[in-house]
């Protein structure tokens, strides 16, 4: 019998050594495994595991009232029965006193690649049976795009990602890939729902081997794989829209755009062209104008225009570009530029959003209709855009704009979180910490003593993926994996299913929640339902017993390579887009009707609220990139992430010119700061990043010293601003951040405490 565990970053074999210790090994069928995942085995047994239920001392003394001490208080160990009793009392009290809309059930994160133990599914099922909850919509990864794309191409974000032109198709006919934001391979190591085999690097290499040229437009050279030998165009962060507008200007001025495609497949071009030519505000979007904004030489802009005019071109937009001030604009403008080139719907090019952002985008696999745990229906209609949680806690009842709607923030009295770490992914963490004190009660299911656990009132210790059985069924991955339990539950921890079952029993709906099914019953249920559903694809799965014995099953790869919007290209009348016009909307009357000042009827240059073109107090632009040695904040306690630290802090990439001007050397502990906070990090001097830009990867566990107001470990979200991309999308804007940096003095340097368990500090 083969033993595997599949995670969001890859699939591994597990075994026991002579001392009964779990060891992980790379799966031999994966040509590009993720190194940091091997550290899961050690992390599953480390000193930061939560050993039993805990309650915060101050909350217990004030029973059901916030005392403002979350994140600063001691914890008291309690029994499971006591923990279930306390939590169920608070849930009932909140429901009966304020209604279910006063409960915010959060599960944002990548807690499990398994379909059954998927934390959000468990949370939704439990709270829907309890009467509902206020929820969040969108993803921090691509919130602006989720709102924008239906208006522009008539497809939701997930359908768009699944429809991407495959690497194989591009390798056959494309000649140039213009990478706005690059294609960093480290990002492609992960995929929501799990990874069988890593394929992105193989796809990019095939394009390169077939002669496709790549241009990396980014402040970071490493945003492009080394083997591509890509042309490097360093650009000021947040100015990609201006560059694209200037390329459109050249195409229009030279009469080099594809008029037939614009006429037959788009609407609203004339209004957009008038803006580009300066007929609306007397400002031409010329190369000279764009150069002053982007810092790219005028000559280089003309050279880029010549490339895209003469070559079959793919316009690739990274997810990171829309996590910035007015983040809707670079994506909208990228689609518009691709439309002007006229190769949308062909293997020659078009546009892409998120190539190399995750493993599955661009692979040669069709989406599978896999089934999951039934979740029921949420009777509460209140929701927030996912990145507006601090606003919600600060301003209950306040009206806000979202996608043309006027909505109000719910008044939250209780937060229940399982699967995720808002003290990683949210912006302006000092502001979040204050807002986090407002609810009466905060309950979490958590594996380790991370910042999320330390800012809670009631803590249920949860299992890792190694401590449970599950099924990796990713709709966008051809490999299905039997996730087998590798070790017994650590100490007194439980699965999320067991935790919610215990609460459901206290609250009187255990039978409805479990349907009298065990863990393995549910796993087989999901397999059986998926086996039925896949018949629509003319495919057959083996029996569950055969699959479980072998440990994995691989589905066939389709013979026809997908090309995005190919049906629309072949016959726009027969296969219209789901936009009001049935076409690509370069100008949108729907968005125009919203009358928003920060998102107009067509792509537009908006000056960011912080950027290198308007320096006042802070002279460096901070990029908080995805980390190489962990997934977001997951496994920051793992060996690979720990070994990447500099003097125990997260490394910050600094250009040699900026370091020299500040008398900083490699390995120094430095202080990054702005009006929102202060962060310690370890200096890594490199000309891989352009002058004026520093890079501090996201995901270092938040480790604040509340007395000195300094974050000790290197979490960039202490410095980022918490404001929406626009009134349309309300996405996060973490990449619009100016900071200053200096060598830290002795009084500012403190030991990192986040990896010391509260259980061992007594």
Question: How does the language model describe each region?
Answer:
Residues 59-82, 249, 254-298, 302, ...:
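N-terminal leader/propeptide and maturation segments of large enzyme subunits in energy/redox metabolism
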Residues 1-8, 440-441, 447-448, 482-508, ...:
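Phosphate/diphosphate-binding loops
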Residues 1-256, 297, 505, 704-762:
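N-terminal export/assembly segments and adjacent metallocofactor-ligating motifs
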Residues 138, 247, 267-394:
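Active-site phosphate/pyrophosphate-binding segments
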Residues 496-550, 633, 638-653, 657-762:
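Long, contiguous, secondary-structure-rich segments that constitute the structural scaffold
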Residues 119-206, 210-217, 242-245, 339-454, ...:
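Extended redox/cofactor-interaction regions of prokaryotic respiratory oxidoreductases
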Residues 228-234, 466, 478-490, 639:
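Short beta-alpha connecting loops at secondary-structure transitions
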Residues 223, 450-483:
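Flexible glycine/proline-rich, aromatic-decorated loop/lid segments
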